[in-house]
Amino acid sequence: MPPTPEVGLPLWLLAELTYRCPLQCPYCSNPLDFAAQGQELSTEQWFKVMAEAREMGAAQIGFSGGEPLVRQDLAQLIAEARRLGYYTNLITSGIGLNEARIADFKKAGLDHIQISFQASDEQVNNLLAGSKKAFAQKLEMARAVKAHGYPMVLNFVTHRHNIDKIDRIIELCIALEADFVELATCQFYGWAHLNRLGLLPTRAQLERAERITNEYRDKLKAEGNPCKLIFVTPDYYEERPKACMNGWGNLFLTITPDGTALPCHGARQLPVQFPNVRDHDLHHIWYESFGFNRFRGYEWMREPCRSCDEKEKDFGGCRCQAFMLTGDASNADPVCAKSTEHGIILKAREEAETAQLAIEQMTFRNDRNSRVIARG
């Protein structure tokens, strides 16, 4: 067994400021029971979190949610992060954004804004978002972000209901003069896992979308267009797992709205007691807490991971995915073809070939559905 690697620094801090959100995306990665979570951290508590993380080496902070724009202290949080020396990202739907707030964020020192879209056409975008005004607002704010001197960074979550229009999505991004476009095929955590039958593309859909994306890359390069297209494939069509978060508690630190500290944004669902910043400082949380040490190193591994010569590369894959699909977070990620549970993934691929779940039939991410799920 290789020696346990030294614990890395929490270089990337994800500040999930709130679970409140005006949209209802059925692929949201937030916990299913978000409506039953505790009170949000105050401005001062977030200041303390940011200061402690910065002292430990954190260099980049992402303000996320839910929808972070619902926090009225967002400009204050950005300004404090800037003062502390962070590179600052705002990850937003654009709903709740306006010219005045963009100017405020610019003045506060915000470095980067990413706006998400649900689709390239208004009807599908608004249906998925659960809002009749979402698409027009997103278009307006994408242009406004660019006008204020920010690079235009767009994120499209692709799935079986919009991936066949990947060419239209890319054309929209080109028309908007986007600088970076993330074409992120749905990853199946949170609400997306619940709605997998309505979201997972077929292999043919995925291969076609990737081919078209590559054709557009060649076209953009030939035209001298600097727009960068980033295509993210789903785990379900891989034969080896990803090195999730570059290893458990090794680089990435999430703080949830109520102050729970997690080694990744999906870990809250695990049957592990994670610490809270209301009770402990981040140094204790990162280096000493049970939750952050639970899956570090290799001693926790079972076969086939334990004797696998690839374990130092992929760390056994995603613990959350192992738990969701096998019921035990210590098992190998079933995405891996070496896993005895890989048949779960093969079955999901087969089901995608015949799935008939329409957008309207999916369980949308909203307070009502979350409360029902929380009650069991």
From Swiss-Prot:
Cofactor note: Binds 1 [4Fe-4S] cluster. The cluster is coordinated with 3 cysteines and an exchangeable S-adenosyl-L-methionine.
GO biological process, one term: pyrroloquinoline quinone biosynthetic process
Key words, A-Z: 4Fe-4S, Iron, Iron-sulfur, Metal-binding, Oxidoreductase, PQQ biosynthesis, S-adenosyl-L-methionine
Cofactor(s) essential for the protein: [4Fe-4S] cluster
PROSITE patterns recorded: MOAA_NIFB_PQQE, RADICAL_SAM
Annotated InterPro entries: 4Fe4S-binding_SPASM_dom, Aldolase_TIM, Elp3/MiaA/NifB-like_rSAM, MoaA_NifB_PqqE_Fe-S-bd_CS, PQQ_synth_PqqE_bac, PqqE-like, Radical_SAM_PqqE_MftC-like, rSAM
SUPFAM superfamilies reported for this sequence: Radical SAM enzymes
Pfam families named among the record's database cross-references: Fer4_12 (PF13353), Radical_SAM (PF04055), SPASM (PF13186)
UniProt pathway annotation: Cofactor biosynthesis; pyrroloquinoline quinone biosynthesis
Domain of life where this protein originates: Bacteria
Reported function: Catalyzes the cross-linking of a glutamate residue and a tyrosine residue in the PqqA protein as part of the biosynthesis of pyrroloquinoline quinone (PQQ).
Protein family according to the UniProt entry: Belongs to the radical SAM superfamily. PqqE family.
Subunit structure: Interacts with PqqD. The interaction is necessary for activity of PqqE.
This protein's name: PqqA peptide cyclase
UniProt source species: Pseudomonas putida (strain ATCC 700007 / DSM 6899 / JCM 31910 / BCRC 17059 / LMG 24140 / F1)
